[in-house]
Amino acid sequence: VAPTGRKPKETSTMADLLTPLSFAGLNLRNRIVMPPMWSGQAHPNGSVTEKIIDYHRVRAAAGCGLVIVEHSFVLPRGRHSATQMGVHSDEMIGGLSWLASAIRAEGAVAALQLSHAGSRASSVVLGTRPAAPSAVRHPYEPAGDIPDELTPGQISETVAAFGDAAIRAREAGFDAVEIHAAHGFLLSEFLSPLTNRRQDEYGDSLEGRSKIHIEVLAEVRRRAGSGFPIFVRLG
């Protein structure tokens, strides 16, 4: 209640939630967004299954304006789990196209989240140690592996992989991509001084720790084109 005893003026209502929204070339039927939520139902090679398609189709049919499909690894070494979706290979495009088509057929806009798990990956899944900004065990994974520190060359390969993944998403028919830089995954690890102890151009200062984010965003924009919407989940 306002100091005068009057209720503060409402600038929006729940009714706005159901009104259309247009931005960045996207036209949403409403403002309801399904965020990326891992379903854990991909094939062992990371490809899309009927269960994943049905899972997202139902949410789109329920009325979501935008469906952001669950995190999908851009490199095999960035895989978080054995049942995670992948966008690391052209072989994934066929299944991804079925998924995007199913979402769009129900009237929703379809986006795909691109990710690399960093040290939140596991040697049990990968068959090798995970890779991260520094050889530091992730605080979210106290029993996890101590990762290998990425070399500058491997960082460049990772940046390029995000660009490759964005092209695959676009070719598969997705309307947008989201870069996953949250939840303690690789890009989030680079940003935090707890997990980034580097003293080179990719560490040491906030400017250095955020360098890879700028490079990934620039590469995705370069590869996907100027008119393709890009979201960034930062955390």
Predicted regions and their residues:
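Non-globular sequence segments
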Residues: 115-174
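Glycine-rich, proline-tolerant flexible connector loops at the mouths of alpha/beta enzymes
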Residues: 68-93, 114-127, 178-204
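Conserved, mostly hydrophobic/aromatic
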Residues: 34, 59, 63, 103, ...
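N-terminal amphipathic alpha-helix/helix-capping segment at the start of soluble metabolic enzymes
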Residues: 14-36, 103, 221
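Catalytic domains of carbohydrate-active enzymes, especially glycoside hydrolases
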Residues: 53-75, 171-176
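Short, Lys/Arg-enriched N-terminal segments with co-localized hydrophobic residues
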Residues: 1-13
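Structural preference for beta-strand elements that scaffold enzyme active sites
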Residues: 31-33, 66, 109-111, 176-178, ...
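Alpha-helix-loop-beta-strand connector modules within alpha/beta enzyme cores
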Residues: 85-110, 194-230
